[in-house]
């Protein structure tokens, strides 16, 4: 079994790590950064990922996709999707299956596809470091992700060419990294406030056993919401001062978003910052500039309710685990937003203790995923991870009631069966509708999917016995079966959301991704060949000018001919031809090298003679009489 990489697929940034010896290690990307922006852009038929996509966002906002994790596994009519539509500059569209997709460069992409592009970048980063192919990964998700979101994340891995060995909850991964190679037994809380989601998990750690007791959270609360508050504040201030509403100017909005994120980060360490955006817009009187002094106190006032929203899930998680705040021995902070002093203050106030800041909040989740990868390929031993399902699972029964089969915070993997019957006389088929959530009526919960069990022998209602079995695997993904005990007829399914990607769609996306990877590789080879050729042309022309007179007319003619041939193909798209002409010029240029060496050899004795002459010093001597 080869190396298993751990990937933190984040809303704002992503990170990849691997076990190196007995320690997990974060891998730097090609730009030398330890995290990569979770941003994809399409420009002139080219796909950009990470920092390169982020750099051009201002001028290409319609085709720059970010925070897609907030859309993954969601239906287009989801209220959270509607909320996002009013914030992001790119188009969110309704897919044929009812899911929320994004539109860029006149193409539609599923959130799983966009996520796959980011995962491909993480995969390439690991392969460049390891010098070997990577095919297996552990990918993290928010603990409060439902089945559809987990399945969509797994699909993203498959599209990226990865076998996803395990989907692991982000707080659990953080706890793994925190408790790795620590022998002390502790009850900890992991408070994870990232770019787009919030999770809190309560765990007991003892002798290498990491047992999650409960989890809670909000999959639509994170740093993006903090940025939006600052952005709206800047729009309001500018409107009051200049009478111009920037909310309808996409270019200005993108600049404001970047400025808001930058100011938020600066105010984690400073108490005041200046937001200066020259030429933000213009009217009949000329260009307008935005220059606003922004304080930490103003920021805290703007986002106070968002921070407060994280406290109720903490309270519920403690209650579900059967603990009081005073029972928690350590609070581990995860996610970039936990650098904000006001967030740390709120955590300290609720748990009654100073939070632990000994882990890097941007990297700890990827490190934990790498450790879990090490467990799965036997590199790491003596660790047992017991995670839980975040939401209750059940089916719709008579009257639209939600009947739970598996309660939230049940340790996974788990399996539970219950016998149901028909609601009508002579009913030959039943539809099993599977829901996930905590409300008492099925319609108020998340419909994960449905399937039919047919061929039930005709009988009065209430007589047939239909056994429904829920099986949740270690990834938190749901498998359901229904069996008529009289006839033995059985129907088994891995729940696929009412939307979701079909197997055929996933396979097509895998092929597209492989094709794009080949095209990207060919494009890179072409650029590298052109760069090498261009460099050779420049150096040859320079040396030809300096030493051309040292060559015979035949040799000089051969070099000039090869030089002209290479220059003629520099603008072509034929990599092989450019390489061929480059090799020809390299061979012809050997004659220049010989001429250069000969010229330097001839000048060296004269130079040495001159140097020796310089060492001879004529001196006048004068006798000095002693007095």
UniProtKB/Swiss-Prot annotation:
Bias (Basic and acidic residues): 612-627
Domain of life: Bacteria
Chain positions with Phosphothreonine modification: 197
Full protein name: Chaperone protein DnaK
InterPro entries: ATPase_NBD, Chaperone_DnaK, Heat_shock_70_CS, HSP70_C_sf, HSP70_peptide-bd_sf, Hsp_70_fam
Entries under Pfam families matching the protein: HSP70
Gene name of the encoded protein: dnaK
Chain intervals for the UniProt region annotation (Disordered): 598-627
General function of this protein: Acts as a chaperone.
Coiled coil region boundaries: none
Alphabetized UniProt keyword annotations: ATP-binding, Chaperone, Nucleotide-binding, Phosphoprotein, Stress response
Bias (Low complexity): 599-610
């Amino acid at each position: 079994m080869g190396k298993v990489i751990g990937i933190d697929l984040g809303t704002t940034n992503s990170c990849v790590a691997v076990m190196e010896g007995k320690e997990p290690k974060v891998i730097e990307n090609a730009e030398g950064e330890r995290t990569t922006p979770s941003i994809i852009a399409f420009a002139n038929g080219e796909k950009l990922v990470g920092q390169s996509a982020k750099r051009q966002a201002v001028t290409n906002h319609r085709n720059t996709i970010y925070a897609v994790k907030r859309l993954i596994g969601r239906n287009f009519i989801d209220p959270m999707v509607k909320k996002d539509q009013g914030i992001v500059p790119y188009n969110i569209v309704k897919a044929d299956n009812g899911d929320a997709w994004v539109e860029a460069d006149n193409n539609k992409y599923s959130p799983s596809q966009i996520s796959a592009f980011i995962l491909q970048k993480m995969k390439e980063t690991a392969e460049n470091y390891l010098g070997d192919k990577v095919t297996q990964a552990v990918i993290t998700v928010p603990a409060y992700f439902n089945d559809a979101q987990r399945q969509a994340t797994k699909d993203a891995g498959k599209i990226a060419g990865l076998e996803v060995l395990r989907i692991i909850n982000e707080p659990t991964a953080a706890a793994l990294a925190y408790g790795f190679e620590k022998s002390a037994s502790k009850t900890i809380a992991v408070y994870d406030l990232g770019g787009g989601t919030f999770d809190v998990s309560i765990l007991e750690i003892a002798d290498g056993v990491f047992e999650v007791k409960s989890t809670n959270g909000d999959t639509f609360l994170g740093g993006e919401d903090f940025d939006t508050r600052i952005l709206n504040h800047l729009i309001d201030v500018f409107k009051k001062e200049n009478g111009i509403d920037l909310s309808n100017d996409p270019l200005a909005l993108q600049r404001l978003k970047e400025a808001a994120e930058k100011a938020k980060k600066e105010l984690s360490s400073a108490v005041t910052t200046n937001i200066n955006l020259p030429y933000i817009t213009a009217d009949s009187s000329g260009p307008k500039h935005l220059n606003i002094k922004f304080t930490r106190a103003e920021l805290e006032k703007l986002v106070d309710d968002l921070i407060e929203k994280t406290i109720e899930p903490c309270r519920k998680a403690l209650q579900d685990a059967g603990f009081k705040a005073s029972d928690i021995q350590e609070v581990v902070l995860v996610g970039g937003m936990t650098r904000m002093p006001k967030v740390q203050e709120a955590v300290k106030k609720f748990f009654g203790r100073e939070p632990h800041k000994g882990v890097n909040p941007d990297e700890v989740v990827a490190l934990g995923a790498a450790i879990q990868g090490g467990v799965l390929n036997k590199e790491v031993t003596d660790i047992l991870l017991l995670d839980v399902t975040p939401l209750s699972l059940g089916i719709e029964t008579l009257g639209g009631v939600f009947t739970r089969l598996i309660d939230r915070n049940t340790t996974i993997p788990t399996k539970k069966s219950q016998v149901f019957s028909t609601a009508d006389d002579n009913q030959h088929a039943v539809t099993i509708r599977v829901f996930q959530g905590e409300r008492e009526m099925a319609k108020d919960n998340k419909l994960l999917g449905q399937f039919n069990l047919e061929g039930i022998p005709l009988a009065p209602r209430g007589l047939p016995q239909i056994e429904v079995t829920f099986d949740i695997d270690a990834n938190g993904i749901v498998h359901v079966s229904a069996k008529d005990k009289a006839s033995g007829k059985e129907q088994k399914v891995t729940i696929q959301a009412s939307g979701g990607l079909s197997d055929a769609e996933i396979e097509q996306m895998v092929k597209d991704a492989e094709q794009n990877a080949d095209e990207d590789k060919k494009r890179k080879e072409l650029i590298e060949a052109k760069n090498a050729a261009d460099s050779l042309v420049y150096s040859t022309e320079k040396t030809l000018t300096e030493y051309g007179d040292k060559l015979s007319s035949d040799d000089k003619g051969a070099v000039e001919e090869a030089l002209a041939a290479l220059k003629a193909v520099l603008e072509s798209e034929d990599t092989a031809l450019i390489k061929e002409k480059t090799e020809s010029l390299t061979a012809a240029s050997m004659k220049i090298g010989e001429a250069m060496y000969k010229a330097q050899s001839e000048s060296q004795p004269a130079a040495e003679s001159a140097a020796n002459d310089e060492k001879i010093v004529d001196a006048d001597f004068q006798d000095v009489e002693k007095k």
